[in-house]
Amino acid sequence: MFSCKQHLSLGACVFCLGLLASTPFIWCFVFANLLSLEIFSPWQTHVYRLGFPTACLMAVLWTLVPAKHAVRAVTPAIMLNIASALIFFSLRVYSTSTWVSAPCLFLANLPLLCLWPRLAIEIVYICPAIHQRFFELGLLLACTIFALSVVSRALEVSAVFMSPFFIFLALGSGSLAGARRNQIYTSGLERRRSIFCARGDHSVASLKETLHKCPWDLLAISALTVLVVCVMIVLHVHAEVFFGLSRYLPLFLCGAMASGGLYLGHSSIIACVMATLCTLSSVVVYFLHETLGPLGKTVLFISIFVYYFSGVAALSAAMRYKLKKFVNGPLVHLRVVYMCCFVFTFCEYLLVTFIKS
């Protein structure tokens, strides 16, 4: 049994790791909303808006780096992250022309920020389920704070409102070591120690073993993703569902997707129910979008994604349970979830940019 102090300490650490894991999405969101203006800076706008799918893809690529090399990158990464954010802060305050320097700064810092979701998730999803919820809460809260800053135009008024970004980096990077030292985490890691012929210190699931253990979960997630992508295309063309949402939807997709959803009961039943609700909501929007009005149409369209997130959360939780004996089970979860984020954010970019409703 673990003490209450250990649980509280780990809960605080993983909450801060949630704040840290949000930083690549927040970085993209801030640039896409403050510096994107298609009339005056067309190529910069495309760079910033493509940042969301790029961040998802880079987070997946970081999972291919061995753990010991990823840990060694922490100190240089955090120093460069803070330096880049300070330079951006200075440019916003003191410079009137950022049409070249800002995109270069954005592209230089983004790959390093994408290291944090890998390091955070690798720790969090070895811990008990209650601590995983603290992580997801931290990630969702961080995304919500910056979304509200943009909605209220606070970021446009003053660069001071970038300060939470520095706080997230400082708290999160400082919590990495604390979470690793916690006895609850180390005991979870111990349960994944390899026995007999497995390579390395801990059991690692190969691609073949992952496909063998979770074929139907992966197939169901793929089917749900294809369904919602088709819904996005049809509703964009016929109902103009992205009108007024294009500024906020990528952050919502990344934040809510990575944070999971509500999942109770059997994963396959939840997935079927959520797929049915997605289909029904899309049919209502398709046929009644003029009757519903802008608000009703937007609420129903967003609810389609909420249902999808809940279905995928149930399926990914089932996958994590099947891979609980393997130390790289959390990384499999990250690859699946962030590839779904990549598909949605890239699809949203293509629809809004090239396919006019």
Curated annotation (Swiss-Prot):
Keyword Glycoprotein: yes
GO biological process terms, semicolon-separated: symbiont entry into host cell; virion attachment to host cell
PTM section of the record: Extensively glycosylated by O-linked oligosaccharides.
Protein topology in the membrane: Multi-pass membrane protein
Similarity comment text for this entry: Belongs to the herpesviridae BMRF2 family.
Motif Integrin binding site positions after renumbering to this chain: 199-201
Subcellular location: Virion membrane; Host cell membrane
InterPro entries hit by this protein: Herpes_BMRF2
Topological domains annotated Virion surface: 1-11, 68-70, 122-133, 180-217, 262-267, 320-335
Principal location: virion
GO CC annotation terms, alphabetical: host cell plasma membrane; membrane; virion membrane
UniProt topological domain (Intravirion) ranges: 33-46, 92-98, 155-158, 239-240, 289-298, 357
Upper classification of the organism: Viruses, Duplodnaviria, Heunggongvirae, Peploviricota, Herviviricetes
UniProt protein name: Protein BMRF2
Annotated organism of origin: Epstein-Barr virus (strain AG876)
Keywords for the protein's UniProt record, in alphabetical order: Glycoprotein, Host cell membrane, Host membrane, Host-virus interaction, Membrane, Transmembrane, Viral attachment to host cell, Virion, Virus entry into host cell
Ribonucleoprotein recorded as keyword: no
Assembly and binders: Interacts with BDLF2. Interacts with host beta1 integrin family.
Transmembrane segments: 12-32, 47-67, 71-91, 99-121, 134-154, 159-179, 218-238, 241-261, 268-288, 299-319, 336-356
Pfam families assigned: Herpes_BMRF2
Functional summary from the UniProt entry: Facilitates virus attachment to oral epithelial cells by binding to host beta1 integrin family. Participates in rearrangement of cellular actin to increase intercellular contacts by binding BDLF2 and thereby promote virus cell-to-cell spreading.
Free-text domain note: The RGD motif presumably is the main binding site to host beta1 integrins.
